[in-house]
A protein has these predicted regions:
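Membrane-interfacial helix-loop-helix connectors in multipass membrane proteins
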Residues: 127-150, 208
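Hydrophobic alpha-helical transmembrane segments of multi-pass membrane transport/permease proteins
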Residues: 16-40, 69-75, 180-186
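Helix-loop-helix units of permease transmembrane domains in multi-pass membrane transporters
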Residues: 83-113
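Long, hydrophobic alpha-helical segments
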Residues: 60-86, 121
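Hydrophobic alpha-helical transmembrane segments of polytopic membrane proteins
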Residues: 145-170, 224-230
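Selective transmembrane-helix segments that form parts of the transport pathway or gating/packing helices
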Residues: 16, 72, 76, 101-131
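Terminal transmembrane helical anchor/hairpin motif
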Residues: 35-59, 167, 177-239
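Aromatic- and glycine-rich beta-strand/loop motifs that create alpha-glucan
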Residues: 1-22
Length: 239
């Protein structure tokens, strides 16, 4: 499995796709971050009149992380289809299947490679909210909880995207299916009227974590969905 992880990361970082994703994500999130920072500075006079004014965690970090979450949902399907569907399309996956590796080892290797790339991406993006510590006091609990929420989001989104990628040999179709499923799960509880839809909603679980609220039900949500879709992907590849 280690060989699959290393080989997948090597192919990913050797391709222009990885660097384009990193550059675009930095550019887009920097734009959002500066927008939230500008808004925070513009309401300083109003905040000074409040007895308990919200800090940078609520007005900058949490909204910035929410923007980052949506960007990740758009990027992860592209990464996953490159690691699985692209290899099926080019035929290089056949070499892995002929190697002394089980389907579980291959899928777990691809999964870990995608997560490692996402963590590298998050490490780069976290520099922006951390830079606020040079000018003001920040709530590190909110910062770390929000970062945990983004990591958990990546674990589930990657598992879903890999499963969608296993359904077809065409990279474009795999990306479209993954985006559709992820955005549906993100917006599934838009009217806030169903407890079942609220539990299924990726948006609700992620938002609580990004706001600094750590609940076991949110962690369980990501764990259940990640394991479920990983098992489905392994079964699909074994067929």
């Amino acid at each position: 499995m280690n060989h699959v992880v290393i080989l997948s990361l090597y192919r990913l970082f050797l391709s222009p796709l990885a660097w384009i994703i990193i550059a675009l994500s930095q550019l887009i999130t920097a734009y959002f971050f500066l927008g939230h920072l500008d808004h925070y500075l513009s309401v300083q006079d109003q905040l000074s009149t409040l007895s308990h004014p919200p800090g940078v965690g609520q007005l900058i970090i949490a909204p910035f992380y929410k923007d980052t979450a949506l960007i990740l949902l758009l990027l992860i399907p592209v990464i996953s289809q490159y690691l699985l569907t692209e290899e099926k399309y080019t035929g290089s996956l056949l070499f892995l299947l002929s190697a002394p590796l089980t389907s579980a080892e291959i899928i777990l290797g691809k999964y870990l490679a995608s997560l490692i790339f996402c963590c590298c991406l998050l490490a780069c993006l976290s520099i922006m909210p951390l830079s606020l510590s040079h000018g003001t006091k920040i709530d590190y609990f909110t910062l770390l909880t929000g970062l945990l929420g983004l990591v958990l989001l990546c674990t589930t989104a990657t598992a879903i995207a890999l499963y969608c990628s296993s359904l077809t040999q065409h990279p474009a179709i795999a990306t479209i299916i993954s985006l559709t499923v992820l955005l549906l799960l993100w917006h599934i509880n838009w009217n806030q009227q169903s407890s079942l839809l609220s539990w299924l909603s990726m948006h609700d679980h992620t938002t609580r974590l990004l706001q600094g609220h750590l609940h076991t039900q949110d962690i369980a949500y990501y764990a259940i969905h990640s394991i479920l879709f990983m098992l489905l992907t392994i079964r699909r590849l074994a067929l």
